Amino acid sequence: MATYKEIFGTNIEVLASDPANPVTGQVWYNSTDNVVKGASATTAGAWATATSINTTRGNVATSVQSPVSSVLAYGGSNPGGVVEGETEQYNGTTWTELADLNTARGVSSGGGTNTAALCTGGYLGPPGSTGVVESWNGSSWAEVADLNTARYASGGGVGSNTANLIAGGLSTPPTIVHAQVEQWNGTSWTEVGDLNSSRYASGAAGESYTSAIIAAGGNPGFTGIANVETWNGTSWTEIADVNTARTGLESGGTQTSTIIFGGSVPGTPDPVKTGATEIWNGTSWTEDTDLNTARDGAAPGGGVTATSSAIAIAGTTDAGTLAAVEEWTGAGAPLIQTFTDS
């Protein structure tokens, strides 16, 4: 049998402690632990518990930067239609409360960064939906031009606080599930090409307001769908369905590398919360590791790609709203393994 040196051209290193940043495939002998160790990479993603948000709520809007150590979360709602206006900022370790929204609301769309964010539409509690839009400058919220169509639970918030896209959504009263899409240029909203399928509470991701993906959601019959569409800046095209039809899911990433997680799936007599996580590679959806706590209405968050990082903030379980936060690390994360002779 060939030796390690014959294969790799060098002896195994002897180190007193594990290297700080080992390269995948690197092998060493840890003289303190008296074991041989090696560096590999994870083959599946994983969710880990992070610091809980200060205010328990569901249906929070967010603005997320990559990595997910820079997050702004705002608004939200609790059972009974009670809406929230609180704004909180996450630095990767703790949540800090900042200035409230001028108009408390839940199920609004976010977008932008933690210093330049957008809060679009939402649910006010009875009587229903709003078209009010607010812009965040890092310290306070200011009202800007309203949406053309008041709504909540829109897929979107794709882009910045000066170039944004929202798609679909729900308005009440009367109850209407929308296909309309609106685009923000920093001054006003313009209606652009409609979705092929009306929907609300869908997942959305994208690099900019001209390159987006809308996944699953609820249809006019108020059941979860699996349909997915992509946006090229002009029109929507249907692509491969997700594996688990659902509504109230969250998402992150880009048009060609997307993560979706959580939501509600059909059940009897009521829908059931799910922790199902799926990854889009530009061609197909693959199931990955579930959330630790199944939920819907968890504020979304994603890194630059779905295989890097994402965050699930608060949300609603079958037992009620929660403050729990989970962070996602995708496949390919560094992993140190200990070799044994067994």
Model-predicted segments: where are they?
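Polar, enzyme-active/binding microenvironments
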Residues: 1-342
